[in-house]
């Protein structure tokens, strides 16, 4: 049984999933990106399985090379966008931690409002 057409189709599907993930990351649709990750991983596993079953010819490897290049480029761009997002989240967590420390240090004043007073008498 010739699995070569199926392998080529699986690569095409992986390219589509890769492009979807890049679009979602570019549009900052993080929840959707995470949800699409499993389909991407499954597609990669299917390609690995099919590649083990057949030995792709040199011609087929040449046909697949541009798809692999595109997938790797997309993956690199998605990783860059994710790193930017992680940096943003780390900054927000840091700000939240500072706010919590300030509230903890100054917020528990027994219900009294501390304000400067005029004691010039």
UniProtKB/Swiss-Prot annotation:
<dbReference type="InterPro" id="IPR008622">
    <property type="entry name" value="FliT"/>
</dbReference>
<dbReference type="GO" id="GO:1902209">
    <property type="term" value="P:negative regulation of bacterial-type flagellum assembly"/>
</dbReference>
<protein>
    <recommendedName>
        <fullName>Flagellar protein FliT</fullName>
    </recommendedName>
</protein>
<dbReference type="Pfam" id="PF05400">
    <property type="entry name" value="FliT"/>
</dbReference>
<feature type="region of interest" description="Required for homodimerization">
    <location>
        <begin position="1"/>
        <end position="50"/>
    </location>
</feature>
<keyword id="KW-0678">Repressor</keyword>
<comment type="function">
    <text>Dual-function protein that regulates the transcription of class 2 flagellar operons and that also acts as an export chaperone for the filament-capping protein FliD. As a transcriptional regulator, acts as an anti-FlhDC factor; it directly binds FlhC, thus inhibiting the binding of the FlhC/FlhD complex to class 2 promoters, resulting in decreased expression of class 2 flagellar operons. As a chaperone, effects FliD transition to the membrane by preventing its premature polymerization, and by directing it to the export apparatus.</text>
</comment>
<keyword id="KW-0805">Transcription regulation</keyword>
<dbReference type="GO" id="GO:0044781">
    <property type="term" value="P:bacterial-type flagellum organization"/>
</dbReference>
<feature type="region of interest" description="FliD binding">
    <location>
        <begin position="60"/>
        <end position="98"/>
    </location>
</feature>
<dbReference type="GO" id="GO:0005829">
    <property type="term" value="C:cytosol"/>
</dbReference>
<comment type="subunit">
    <text>Homodimer. Interacts with FliD and FlhC.</text>
</comment>
<comment type="similarity">
    <text>Belongs to the FliT family.</text>
</comment>
<keyword id="KW-1005">Bacterial flagellum biogenesis</keyword>
<keyword id="KW-0963">Cytoplasm</keyword>
<keyword id="KW-0143">Chaperone</keyword>
<keyword id="KW-0804">Transcription</keyword>
<dbReference type="GO" id="GO:0006457">
    <property type="term" value="P:protein folding"/>
</dbReference>
